[in-house]
């Protein structure tokens, strides 16, 4: 009776199946409703709330549009077209191979033996295949052929794509938020498929849009940062009721079957990619029978292929014991069992949560680039969370962050302020600490300054905020609403879901935070202060569907303040102590008014000027309308206050240490731009003013073609008493920085000339100036001058705007405090490069071509008291023969023959470190992996990305990327303390997108090295006094492949590169024995162990395959494998025997080129069949395709001849020719010693101009002429020439060491207006005339006085004579002549003044005549 009842029930059930399918199609409200409602104990298909699908599977099968893998291709796999590119593990794939063996593959899988082996540790690639694959359950399986009538089995697949990919509006015919899934796709013909996709497994209708939306909701629930991902396509593959490869009917009947699913999602740009794995049930552990798991063990993994790396789905001990545990556990326990999520686009990162306790498990943190100001939140995927416990995020060397459990897979942690720039290792653990075993979860967060934060608040054009008047009364404000959640709802996440739109409904306040560095009397120090001064506006965070990925755009009313947090007195006084500030958008708090200085987590903007707030509280500007007069009044008020603040800054800065002595002495600017380009270790392109980097938003130096700044804090040394001239003291960092700007001629621009050149504000002449606060900050990034970006704005940038932009006629005051460098103390670096196929120009100017595979010590500098230890290693590999046709694989060619090496080696990787720094690897990516990134930058075993931040700072290392060309092909690495820098260019930084014959770049690295002069390396290569100088100044021995002969002079520094320098045995073995790391060459090349290199302490560690102790915890990260192995790995067949490497010398190269050219151009060769056959074989193996073109295109360029011949690529040959010519020319200019007189200090620049205004006026031989405008006259010495001045001692003997370069002496030029000059001229004329008159009068007076004096003297003498005569008359009875007579011919003239005596009267006129006649006739008179 019981059996008959069972049969009746089964028959009824079978009859209800079609009806149930119709119900399922008509009402799909129950589809996926088990999410978050997992039935207890439900482990198998058909026993949950859905009759057909498991509790965790998406709908599959023919009724939803799936196609089934062809039974004849189940084992080998059926290849399908994806119709767009999907990224996976660094590669891009538009196809996939689906196999019954539980994988989605992208290459042929070697399936011999019981176990499918993949990955670096299990395969012998390239001798055997190592395919890339997504393997939910990799082991040998089968589709049972003899199933009972009630059971189905197969591998199903479909491709879901958005309608918008085909020009249709997404969601135009669907109701989001409701379950409208309809299974009406079955039987669709190819003609009705998506446009351009003839396969019927492709869906691009409303059902596909709905499915992709559902997958996004799943990802948001389980993956940190998935809210930023928008799925546009998905590949769904379902393995339904597969059985073990070795299984019988009894095994199948007993339920030893497996059902699982893989969903691979990507966006339309193929940038992001996620995989969701669903395990419904797993009935076997291996491809064995009778539940035996000793053979053909099943694996769940992601393999990058070609030894790129392997990531297991579950790296726990439970999985090793039994892989079936995947169906019982989950990476998202809050959703359903058996579900795991991964991000797989570039490197596979596990998402969701894990139950791993010991060892190391990488956390997924979003965002992992965080503003150092803190007060932000990050989402963390780590351990599977329990809401009853408290979890913390421990930050290396900093305080912990409190975390809130959002779901069982995601925790949200509130970060404090972390004043640091660089990577901090973080650990995620329960609060109970040592009471638990969860110590495995390790991650990293990169803290950045606010000026470089890629997630900063978008406030429009930042430079509009620094204009007076502001160009607009409102400014834009843009943010993504999904970055904010309701702070009240986050405390009750057990009641809401992550994809609930109400979670993102909140009120946001826009706050102004002012910054200054002030004296804190409590700690007796100056420290930074961040003060919330007001709230400008309040906005509602939009949470509707369209704002999931669409940004919210609002406007900021600049002259309206919603709430002040300063009283009236503070607004009138303290507000002007804050030179600048920034905006922060954060959710409102209920008690915001009681504690306004504490804000919730939010987004901050770039620094802005606060001058728009100066008039917001002023009553004279409190008008309801805005007019032109109001704008002018505001502008004048800002000018007035800026003038006061400029003077305050001038006085404040003048009271501080004169840092110019440090910047000019220890970081003097390069004299010409080519020196700045070559000096990689000390100077770098300015992040906002560089033509080469295509960023010229430099408002403080408009007019300069390129600006460069010191790539580290200015290093200085002890300068006190007791220092000897030959002492080489240790250097220590300051908090200063140097900025050098160059004009279009490559000459330095000078601040002293700015007032005489910049006639109007629009004249493009704004030189660079040194900075008291280095823009990139100073470790430990905590105190005054040390906050990156903010300290620079407070001490340097904002004073420039106050004095030079806002106030009038105060720019010279600023430049008095910030004078530019005159390059008088600059010494050029030693500069070398390796390019192409091993063409070297060393740092001491030796030139040669060296080829030999292996890892070499490129540069080694031992540690001294004054310099750190520096280690640079390069990896050279044999370049593959690109004439190999990959399409022959599997027919005429084996896997090991795909990579056939040539006899030319290229650099494929470089690694460097110094004392106390992180270890940095820059390696080229493998073939077929260079689509998005052409190189990999690995710091401390962690792969770093430079998509949003092209300047990144690590421990003692600065790395920046020129992202003009796609794929980060140009990387700069600077060791800060050592001041040694390298430049890495992949494939000459060619724009591969424009080359139709190349699908990806070539994988060749060019390495340029710059060594500063403190190491004693002469750039000209003269080593005559090398030993003497090294001993006298205690200099280290600099050696390596970039300086292979430090103790001997090769003489090649005086010559150019010739064919005799190509793999010459005179230096080959010396380089190999001295600098190659043991064990890194080809097999058999290290038979004779040579310790010659160890005599000088050369490193023996291979830094590509080893890790430092502090980095070993990250060795489990998949990128650790990317740096270890070669990128052009060959099979052992090509490393021994006739295929092993042998160097080609210049003579052999020349002979083969001549032979091949003769074979190409000699028509008689083809006339003899036997000779034609022999020459054909020779030409195929030894000749390039067009040898005559090589000789013609290359000419006498040896690097071009060598690379063109070996690579058989004209593009590479011509590029190395151009690179070599450019390098030699630039090196000659960069290594010269330029003599500088500095600049002429102009103190009174009114109406003065320089002729020619932009010409160089600081180098030896330069002439500077100054003139006045036509309204003024010039005075002083107005022509100067820079020349050498030799000092002579007292014996007039010239000392050749005692000289200097100076301008000629003279009074400074100055101008006087013509009106004033005319006035003074007329005044001088009038004064002259008046002076002449006065002079004449004075002369007359002098003469009159003299005359009167003489008259007086005459009168006295006459009175004496009269007295004498009177006495003589009285004694003798009279004179010779009577008194009334005179001497003959000397008639005495009548003088009234003479005869004033009352007793004497002159005689009558007649008596006088009578007397005269008497005298004439009576005396003997002689005339």
Swiss-Prot record:
<dbReference type="GO" id="GO:0005615">
    <property type="term" value="C:extracellular space"/>
</dbReference>
<dbReference type="InterPro" id="IPR057017">
    <property type="entry name" value="F54D1_6-like_C"/>
</dbReference>
<feature type="glycosylation site" description="N-linked (GlcNAc...) asparagine">
    <location>
        <position position="94"/>
    </location>
</feature>
<dbReference type="InterPro" id="IPR051495">
    <property type="entry name" value="Epithelial_Barrier/Signaling"/>
</dbReference>
<feature type="region of interest" description="Disordered">
    <location>
        <begin position="1364"/>
        <end position="1401"/>
    </location>
</feature>
<dbReference type="Pfam" id="PF24469">
    <property type="entry name" value="F54D1_6_C"/>
</dbReference>
<feature type="domain" description="AMOP">
    <location>
        <begin position="638"/>
        <end position="818"/>
    </location>
</feature>
<keyword id="KW-1133">Transmembrane helix</keyword>
<dbReference type="Pfam" id="PF24464">
    <property type="entry name" value="Ig_F54D1_6_2"/>
</dbReference>
<dbReference type="GO" id="GO:0007160">
    <property type="term" value="P:cell-matrix adhesion"/>
</dbReference>
<feature type="glycosylation site" description="N-linked (GlcNAc...) asparagine">
    <location>
        <position position="306"/>
    </location>
</feature>
<dbReference type="Pfam" id="PF06119">
    <property type="entry name" value="NIDO"/>
</dbReference>
<keyword id="KW-0472">Membrane</keyword>
<dbReference type="Pfam" id="PF24678">
    <property type="entry name" value="DUF7658"/>
</dbReference>
<feature type="domain" description="NIDO">
    <location>
        <begin position="184"/>
        <end position="347"/>
    </location>
</feature>
<keyword id="KW-0812">Transmembrane</keyword>
<dbReference type="InterPro" id="IPR057019">
    <property type="entry name" value="F54D1_6-like_Ig-like_2"/>
</dbReference>
<keyword id="KW-0325">Glycoprotein</keyword>
<feature type="glycosylation site" description="N-linked (GlcNAc...) asparagine">
    <location>
        <position position="483"/>
    </location>
</feature>
<feature type="topological domain" description="Cytoplasmic">
    <location>
        <begin position="1343"/>
        <end position="1423"/>
    </location>
</feature>
<feature type="signal peptide">
    <location>
        <begin position="1"/>
        <end position="28"/>
    </location>
</feature>
<dbReference type="InterPro" id="IPR057018">
    <property type="entry name" value="F54D1_6-like_Ig-like"/>
</dbReference>
<protein>
    <recommendedName>
        <fullName>Uncharacterized protein F54D1.6</fullName>
    </recommendedName>
</protein>
<feature type="glycosylation site" description="N-linked (GlcNAc...) asparagine">
    <location>
        <position position="903"/>
    </location>
</feature>
<feature type="glycosylation site" description="N-linked (GlcNAc...) asparagine">
    <location>
        <position position="355"/>
    </location>
</feature>
<feature type="glycosylation site" description="N-linked (GlcNAc...) asparagine">
    <location>
        <position position="666"/>
    </location>
</feature>
<dbReference type="InterPro" id="IPR056075">
    <property type="entry name" value="DUF7658"/>
</dbReference>
<feature type="transmembrane region" description="Helical">
    <location>
        <begin position="1322"/>
        <end position="1342"/>
    </location>
</feature>
<feature type="compositionally biased region" description="Basic and acidic residues">
    <location>
        <begin position="1378"/>
        <end position="1401"/>
    </location>
</feature>
<dbReference type="Pfam" id="PF24462">
    <property type="entry name" value="Ig_F54D1_6"/>
</dbReference>
<dbReference type="InterPro" id="IPR005533">
    <property type="entry name" value="AMOP_dom"/>
</dbReference>
<feature type="topological domain" description="Extracellular">
    <location>
        <begin position="29"/>
        <end position="1321"/>
    </location>
</feature>
<dbReference type="GO" id="GO:0016020">
    <property type="term" value="C:membrane"/>
</dbReference>
<dbReference type="Pfam" id="PF03782">
    <property type="entry name" value="AMOP"/>
</dbReference>
<dbReference type="InterPro" id="IPR003886">
    <property type="entry name" value="NIDO_dom"/>
</dbReference>
<keyword id="KW-0732">Signal</keyword>
């Amino acid at each position: 009776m019981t059996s008959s009842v069972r049969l009746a029930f089964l028959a009824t059930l079978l009859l209800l199946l079609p009806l149930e399918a119709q119900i399922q199609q008509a009402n799909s409200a129950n589809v996926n409703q088990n999410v978050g409602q997992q039935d207890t104990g439900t482990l198998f298909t058909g026993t949950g709330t859905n009759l057909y699908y498991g509790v965790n599977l998406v709908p599959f099968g023919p009724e939803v549009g799936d196609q089934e893998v062809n039974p004849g291709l189940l084992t080998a796999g059926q290849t399908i077209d994806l119709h767009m590119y999907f990224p996976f593990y660094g590669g891009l794939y538009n196809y996939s191979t689906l196999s019954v063996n539980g994988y989605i593959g992208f290459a042929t899988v070697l399936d011999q033996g019981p176990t499918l082996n993949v990955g670096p540790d299990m395969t012998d690639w390239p001798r055997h295949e190592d395919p890339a694959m997504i393997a939910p359950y990799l082991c040998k399986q089968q589709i049972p052929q003899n199933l009972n009538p009630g059971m189905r089995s197969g591998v199903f697949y479909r491709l879901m794509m958005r309608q918008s990919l085909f020009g249709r509006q997404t969601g135009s015919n669907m109701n989001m938020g409701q379950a409208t899934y309809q299974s009406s796709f079955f039987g669709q013909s190819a003609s009705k498929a998506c446009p351009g996709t003839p396969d019927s497994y492709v869906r691009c209708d409303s059902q596909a849009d709905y499915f992709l939306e559902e997958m996004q909701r799943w990802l948001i629930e389980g993956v940190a940062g998935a809210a930023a991902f928008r799925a546009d396509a998905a590949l769904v593959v379902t393995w339904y009721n597969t059985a073990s490869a070795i299984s019988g009917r009894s095994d199948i009947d007993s339920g030893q079957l497996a059902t699982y699913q893989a969903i691979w999602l990507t966006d339309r740009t193929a940038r992001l990619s996620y995989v969701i794995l669903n395990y419904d049930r797993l009935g076997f552990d291996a491809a064995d029978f009778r539940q035996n798991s000793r053979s053909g063990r099943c694996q769940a993994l992601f393999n990058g292929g070609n030894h790129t790396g392997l990531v297991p789905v579950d790296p726990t001990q439970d999985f090793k014991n039994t892989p079936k545990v995947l169906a019982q556990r989950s990476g998202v326990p809050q959703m359903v069992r058996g579900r795991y999520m991964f991000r797989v686009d570039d490197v596979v990162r596990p998402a969701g949560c894990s139950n791993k306790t010991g060892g190391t498990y990488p956390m997924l943190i979003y965002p992992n680039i965080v503003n150092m100001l803190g007060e932000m939140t990050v989402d963390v995927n780590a351990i599977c969370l329990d809401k009853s416990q408290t979890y913390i995020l421990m930050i290396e060397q900093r305080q912990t962050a409190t975390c809130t459990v959002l779901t069982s897979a995601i925790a949200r942690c509130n970060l404090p302020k972390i004043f640091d720039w660089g990577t901090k290792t973080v650990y995620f653990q329960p609060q109970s600490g040592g009471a638990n075993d969860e110590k495995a979860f390790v991650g990293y967060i990169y803290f950045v300054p606010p000026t470089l934060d890629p997630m900063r608040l978008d406030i429009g054009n930042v430079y509009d905020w620094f204009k007076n008047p502001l160009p607009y009364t409102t400014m834009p404000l843009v943010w993504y609403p999904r970055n904010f959640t309701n702070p009240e709802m986050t405390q009750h996440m057990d009641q809401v879901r992550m994809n609930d739109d109400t979670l993102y409904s909140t009120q946001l306040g826009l706050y102004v935070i002012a910054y200054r560095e002030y004296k804190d009397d409590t700690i007796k120090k100056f420290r930074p202060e961040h003060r919330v001064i007001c709230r400008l506006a309040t906005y509602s965070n939009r949470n509707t569907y369209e704002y999931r990925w669409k940004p919210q755009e609002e406007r900021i009313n600049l002259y309206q303040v919603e709430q002040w947090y300063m009283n009236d007195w503070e607004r009138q006084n303290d507000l002007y102590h804050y030179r600048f500030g920034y905006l922060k958008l954060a959710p409102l708090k209920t008690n915001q008014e009681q504690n306004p200085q504490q804000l919730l987590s939010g987004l901050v903007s770039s620094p802005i000027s606060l001058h728009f707030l100066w008039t917001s509280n002023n009553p004279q500007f409190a008008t309801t309308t805005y007019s032109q007069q109001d704008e002018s009044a505001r502008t004048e008020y800002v000018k007035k206050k800026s003038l006061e603040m400029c003077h305050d800054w001038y006085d404040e800065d003048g009271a501080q240490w004169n840092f110019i002595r440090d910047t000019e002495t220890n970081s003097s600017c390069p004299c010409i731009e080519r020196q700045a380009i070559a000096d990689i270790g000390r100077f770098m392109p300015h992040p906002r003013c560089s033509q080469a980097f295509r960023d010229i938003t430099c408002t403080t130096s408009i007019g300069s073609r390129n600006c460069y700044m010191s790539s580290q804090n200015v290093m200085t040394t002890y300068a006190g008493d007791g220092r000897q001239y030959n002492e080489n003291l240790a250097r220590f960092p300051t908090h200063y920085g140097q900025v050098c700007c160059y004009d279009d001629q490559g000459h330095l621009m000078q601040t002293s000339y700015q007032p005489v050149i910049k006639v109007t504000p629009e004249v493009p002449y704004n030189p660079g100036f040194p900075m008291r606060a280095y823009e990139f900050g100073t470790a430990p990034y905590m105190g005054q001058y040390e906050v990156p970006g903010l300290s620079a704005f407070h001490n340097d940038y904002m004073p420039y705007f106050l004095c030079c932009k806002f106030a009038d006629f105060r720019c010279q005051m600023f430049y008095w405090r910030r004078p530019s460098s005159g390059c008088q103390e600059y010494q050029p670096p030693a500069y070398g490069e390796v390019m192409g196929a091993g063409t070297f120009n060393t740092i001491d100017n030796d030139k040669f071509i060296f080829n030999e595979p292996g890892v070499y010590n490129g540069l080694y500098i031992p540690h001294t008291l004054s310099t750190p230890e520096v280690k640079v290693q390069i990896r050279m590999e044999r370049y593959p023969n690109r004439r190999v046709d990959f399409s022959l694989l599997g027919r005429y060619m084996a896997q090991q023959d795909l990579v056939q090496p040539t006899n030319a080696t290229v650099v494929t990787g470089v690694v460097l470190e110094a004392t106390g720094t992180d270890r940095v690897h820059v390696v080229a990516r493998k073939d077929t992996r260079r689509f998005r990134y052409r190189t990999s930058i690995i710091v401390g075993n962690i792969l770093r990305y430079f998509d949003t931040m092209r300047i990144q700072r690590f421990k003692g290392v600065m790395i920046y990327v020129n992202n003009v060309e796609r794929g980060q092909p140009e990387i700069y690495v600077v060791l800060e303390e050592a001041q040694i820098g390298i430049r890495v260019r992949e494939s000459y930084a060619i724009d591969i997108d424009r080359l139709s014959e190349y699908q990806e770049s070539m994988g060749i690295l060019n390495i340029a090295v710059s060594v500063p002069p403190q190491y004693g390396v002469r750039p000209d290569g003269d080593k005559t006094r090398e030993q003497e100088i090294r001993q006298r100044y205690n200099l280290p021995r600099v050696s390596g492949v970039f300086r292979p002969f430090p103790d001997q002079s090769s003489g090649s520094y005086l010559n150019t590169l010739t064919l005799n320098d190509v793999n010459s045995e005179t230096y080959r073995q010396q380089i190999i024995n001295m600098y190659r790391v043991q064990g890194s060459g080809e097999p058999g090349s290290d038979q004779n162990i040579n310790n010659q290199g160890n005599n000088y302490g050369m490193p023996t560690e291979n830094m590509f395959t080893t890790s430092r102790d502090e980095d070993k915890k990250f060795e489990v990260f998949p990128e650790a494998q990317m740096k270890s192995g070669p990128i052009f790995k060959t099979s052992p067949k090509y490393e021994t025997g006739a295929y092993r490497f042998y160097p080609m010398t210049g003579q052999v190269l020349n002979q083969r080129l001549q032979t091949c050219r003769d074979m190409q151009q000699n028509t008689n060769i083809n006339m003899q069949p036997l000779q034609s056959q022999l020459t054909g074989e020779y030409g195929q193996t030894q000749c390039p395709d067009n040898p005559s073109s090589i000789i013609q295109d290359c000419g006498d360029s040896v690097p071009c001849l060598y690379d063109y011949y070996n690579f058989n690529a004209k593009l590479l040959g011509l590029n190395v020719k151009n690179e070599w010519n450019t390098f030699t020319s630039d090196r000659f200019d960069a290594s010269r010693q330029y003599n500088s007189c500095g600049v002429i200090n102009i103190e009174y620049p009114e109406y003065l101009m320089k002729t020619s205004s932009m010409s160089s006026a600081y180098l030896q031989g330069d002439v500077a002429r100054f003139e006045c405008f036509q309204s003024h006259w010039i005075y002083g010495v107005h022509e100067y020439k820079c020349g050498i001045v030799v000092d002579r001692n007292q014996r007039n003997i010239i000392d050749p060491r005692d000289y200097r370069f100076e301008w000629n002496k003279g009074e400074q030029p100055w101008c006087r207006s013509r009106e004033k000059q005319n006035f003074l001229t007329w005044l001088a004329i009038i004064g002259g005339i008046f002076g002449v008159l006065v002079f004449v009068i004075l002369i007359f007076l002098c003469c009159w006085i003299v005359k009167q004096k003489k008259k007086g003297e005459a009168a006295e003498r006459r009175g004496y004579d009269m007295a004498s005569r009177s006495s003589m008359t009285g004694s003798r009875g009279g004179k010779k002549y009577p008194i009334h007579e005179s001497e003959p011919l000397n008639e005495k003239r009548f003088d009234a003044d003479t005869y004033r005596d009352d007793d004497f009267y002159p005689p009558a006129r007649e008596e006088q005549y009578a007397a005269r006649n008497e005298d004439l006739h009576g005396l003997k008179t002689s005339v």
